[in-house]
Amino acid sequence: MQEFSLWCDFIERDFLENDFLKLINKGAICGATSNPSLFCEAITKSAFYKDEIAKLKGKKAKEIYETLALKDILQASSALMPLYEKDPNNGYISLEIDPFLEDDAPKSIDEAKRLFKTLNRPNVMIKVPASESGLEVVSALTKASIPVNATLVFSPKIARKTAQILAKEAQKRAVISVFVSRFDKEIDPLVPKNLQAKSGIINATECYYQINQHANKLTSALFASTGVKSNTLAKGYYIKALCFKNSINTAPLEALNAYLLDPNTEYQTPLKITEIEAFKKELKACNIDLENTAQKLLKEGLIAFKQSFEKLLSSF
């Protein structure tokens, strides 16, 4: 069984050349993730891409994006490679496929295989949304021995289904990215104070149980969206609450740094299934169903990544 580990949910050229290396060298992180929104934020706001973008002028927008993004992914891969070589459970960087291909499994599979072949690094994970068509992609990629990060998982049912697919096919490392804080942002305005800032953690815990029950030893739960979205919570709140054995937490820098500075970090015991069910009954009394919320958040997440990718491409 793997222990709890931290990954960094951020990617940007200057960061990769400086603080990213420091975090790795001091043993703070052992992996990293990226997504279309992070690349949009980095490439459109950082000055470190401007000269390269200027040199690529005249090329198609997606070609410019891939040139920039793959360079960052390769740099992250190189920095993490010593960790991977020491322990192939660690040292991964994730790259997401074009979000506009999300509902086209054959094209998604082709793009994922092309990107993985182009990068030619064993510690690169291809990130695929766990939508209905996305799970077809997950299955195909695992059959092709490509490490997979199944992302935008909000539902325990989808967590179980994804874990079962990976258990059948996965010959390489895989993670199932369970999104956390978006639940609380959605639900907290609708519930009394004693139920606030709990839905994301409790839903993620149920997903964690499903993954550990149905996945193989190469697959781990990865808690994502663990930056706080409320000023009333400590920055490392979600990392600390979900510090479970055999799990990973990928966090934005603010949350990551807060957690690393916290002297009181230790393994947490996940809530019992009976406690989870009791909480869900309390939500039901407020006319809230976590499964319905999960479906809504998945749709919103898919749209948000498409919007970010479109914004990035149009900036070229």
Curated annotation (Swiss-Prot):
Its EC number is 2.2.1.2. PROSITE patterns: TRANSALDOLASE_1 (PS01054), TRANSALDOLASE_2 (PS00958). It comes from the Bacteria. GO terms for biological process: carbohydrate metabolic process; pentose-phosphate shunt. It catalyses: D-sedoheptulose 7-phosphate + D-glyceraldehyde 3-phosphate = D-erythrose 4-phosphate + beta-D-fructose 6-phosphate. InterPro entries: Aldolase_TIM (IPR013785), TAL/FSA (IPR001585), Transaldolase_2 (IPR004732), Transaldolase_AS (IPR018225). GO terms for molecular function: transaldolase activity. The active site is at K127. Pathway: Carbohydrate degradation; pentose phosphate pathway; D-glyceraldehyde 3-phosphate and beta-D-fructose 6-phosphate from D-ribose 5-phosphate and D-xylulose 5-phosphate (non-oxidative stage): step 2/3. Keywords: Cytoplasm, Pentose shunt, Schiff base, Transferase. Its main location: cytoplasm. One of its GO terms (cellular component) is cytoplasm. NCBIfam families: PRK03903.1, tal_mycobact. Belongs to the transaldolase family. Type 2 subfamily. This is Transaldolase. It comes from Helicobacter pylori (strain Shi470).
